[in-house]
């Protein structure tokens, strides 16, 4: 490609960015033609910059000029890329020409033939729209000119006087209205103040209401809680009224050949060796039961006083200051000691005294087993069983103790029936 062809394709269309070939006549443009092209297309309309818009002038961006670019940025250069410092005079002339055209119109130059035709069509369309608008304005102006008539001065003066009188009347009415407005404003202020006071009273009322409502809710909660507690207490009271304290505290039953009190076996068998600590505990519970029953009916034993002392309970002989132990430890020496037997006989005597006291109060009361002189008699067989352990078999002794506990259970049942509230 020749040098001339390279320079002929040095610009691009500013719309489609396609490379364009310039007409050769642009090479021969004169200085006078350049000067004329530099003149603005539109004359100065005499408008000055509005002070309010002065701040926006700082953000004004002038149109891009080809000559302001060092390397021709903004145009597509398809030449051999030589340094811009060596740009030919013809290229600079063309660049200045396009800058002049761009600064005097809203369209950036150069344009290719197709884009120029497209822009001409757009401008023709805008021109036709402007001409149509001008025709409309011209017709309206002609109509206004035809309607213009000579003014009637007298009628206008009369109308002016009427307007002045109307103005005075309106001013007077306005003054009255202002007074009325002031009066209404004062009334509104008073009403507003009263409203504020009522609002404060309402707020105070609601605070008091909320406070009392909360206290009421707490009181109702306390009331419901107390009602629940009372109901529970009544339930427990009814349950306690129906409950026999003696039956709960002293459970007399049997386990095979043994009589038991609170699950402690009273007695021994050759085949069942009951530990003496269990026998002593059973005697302690038995003494405690008889003592409680006697105290309940107000009975004081003659000759003896039963003393509950756990597994070391005893019977005190009144007048002799002597204690008869109701506990033992076994062994050869124990079986030859008569104090344990004497204590059991004394206890049986106290139980007999309790029986007689109950029979005085209730003639129909009768124990299932008769007791006399340290023995218990089975009415079904007529056999008597000694409560002593000396010179007695363990079977006989255990059966006597079982019968004794049975009699004691009957006495417990009678006392419970007499002293339990209906």
UniProtKB/Swiss-Prot annotation:
Disordered as annotated region, ranges: 182-201
Family note: Belongs to the beclin family.
S-S pairs: none
Organism encoding this protein: Drosophila melanogaster
Gene name tied to this protein: Atg6
Oligomeric form and interacting partners: Interacts with Rab18, preferentially binding to the GTP-bound form.
Sections of the chain in a coiled coil: 119-243
Protein name: Beclin-1-like protein
BP-aspect Gene Ontology terms: autophagosome assembly; autophagy; cellular response to nitrogen starvation; cellular response to starvation; defense response to Gram-negative bacterium; endocytosis; glycophagy; hemopoiesis
Highest taxon, organism lineage: Eukaryota
Annotated GO MF terms: phosphatidylinositol 3-kinase binding; protein-macromolecule adaptor activity; small GTPase binding
GO cellular component, one term: phosphatidylinositol 3-kinase complex, class III, type I
Keyword vocabulary terms for this entry: Coiled coil
Gene3D superfamilies: 6.10.250.3110, Autophagy protein 6/Beclin 1 (1.10.418.40)
Protein task: Plays a central role in autophagy.
């Amino acid at each position: 490609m020749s040098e001339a062809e390279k320079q002929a394709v040095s610009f691009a269309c500013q719309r489609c960015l396609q490379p364009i070939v310039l007409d050769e006549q642009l090479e021969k443009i004169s200085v006078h033609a350049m000067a004329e092209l530099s003149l603005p297309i539109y004359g100065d309309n005499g408008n000055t910059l509005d002070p309010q818009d002065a701040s926006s002038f700082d953000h004004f961006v002038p149109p891009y000029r080809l000559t302001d670019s060092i390397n021709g940025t903004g145009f597509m250069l398809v030449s051999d890329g030589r340094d811009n410092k060596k740009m030919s005079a013809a290229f600079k002339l063309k660049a200045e020409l396009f800058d002049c055209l761009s600064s005097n119109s809203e369209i950036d130059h150069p344009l290719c033939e197709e884009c120029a035709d497209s822009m001409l069509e757009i401008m023709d369309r805008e021109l036709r729209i402007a001409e149509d608008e001008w025709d409309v304005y011209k017709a309206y102006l002609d109509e206004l000119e035809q309607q213009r008539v000579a003014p009637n001065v007298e009628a206008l003066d009369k109308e002016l006087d009427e307007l002045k009188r109307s103005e005075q009347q309106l001013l007077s009415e306005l003054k009255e209205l202002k007074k009325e407005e002031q009066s209404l404003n004062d009334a509104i202020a008073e009403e507003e103040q009263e409203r504020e006071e009522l609002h404060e009273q309402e707020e105070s009322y609601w605070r008091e209401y909320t406070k009392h409502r909360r206290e009421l809710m707490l009181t109702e909660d306390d009331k419901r809680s107390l009602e629940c507690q009372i109901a529970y207490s009544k339930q427990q009271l009814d349950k306690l009224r129906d409950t026999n304290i003696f039956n709960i505290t002293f459970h007399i039953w049997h386990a095979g050949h043994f009589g038991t009190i609170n699950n402690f076996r009273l007695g021994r068998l050759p085949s069942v060796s009951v530990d003496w600590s269990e026998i002593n505990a059973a005697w302690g519970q038995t003494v405690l039961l008889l003592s409680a029953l006697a105290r309940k009916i107000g009975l004081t034993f003659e000759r003896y006083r039963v003393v509950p002392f756990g597994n070391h309970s005893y019977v005190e002989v009144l007048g002799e200051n002597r204690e008869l132990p109701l506990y033992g430890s076994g062994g050869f020496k124990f079986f030859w000691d008569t104090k344990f037997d004497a204590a059991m006989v004394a206890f049986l005597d106290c139980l007999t005294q309790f029986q007689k006291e109950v029979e005085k109060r209730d003639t129909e009361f009768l124990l299932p087993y008769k007791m006399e002189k340290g023995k218990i008699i089975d009415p079904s067989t007529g056999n008597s069983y000694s409560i002593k352990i000396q010179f007695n078999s363990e079977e006989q002794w255990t059966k006597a103790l079982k019968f004794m506990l049975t009699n004691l259970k009957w006495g417990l049942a009678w006392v419970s029936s007499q002293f339990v509230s209906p």
